[in-house]
Amino acid sequence: MFRKFAKNEVEPLAAELDRTHQFPYETFKKMADLGLTGLPIPEEWGGAGATYLDFAMFIEEIAKVCASTAVVMSVHTGLGCMSIYLYGSDRLKEKYLRPLAKGEIVGAYALTEPNAGSDAASLKCRAEDKGDHFIVNGSKIFITNGGIAQTYCTFVKTDPTAPPGKGITCLIIEKDTPGFTISKPVEKMGLH
């Protein structure tokens, strides 16, 4: 099924997506309709209940014909969904994981920073716990699905006194959160 889907639904659009730098909305919707956007997520949370090996084989088949679409899906499911599935409360799973796994919304993962790269131990982005919300200050870059996603699993330093690599929290930030801004995409080679 994965190979057939990749050949029939992904490959015909790959060159155009690469040329136009567009998100594969049409393909993402078809994946959602088939239960592929939440492949390794249990059915109780809106996923297909497949194994992570199944998910890896799916991504491999997509990557054979379109690396960009494979990255979109691996970030959405492997990072956006799995971060919440593995570490989120039932309340967070109900609110975010279920619509992510069903492909009703798109997920992103925000770790990389301008001055720290993807080194989580060197994060500069800070979040201050205000009891019922956090105040986040900092910047992230190179966010796959950035600008498209509705939720961002965002890694921040919540304890500035903690040693490097400690005192880090993953916050789910919604796209329409006041103060959350998305800059113009960076021009890069490949993986648009």
Where would I find each of the regions flagged by the language model?
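A short core secondary-structure module
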Residues: 133, 137-183
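N-terminal glycine-rich flavin-associated loop
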Residues: 71-91, 117-120
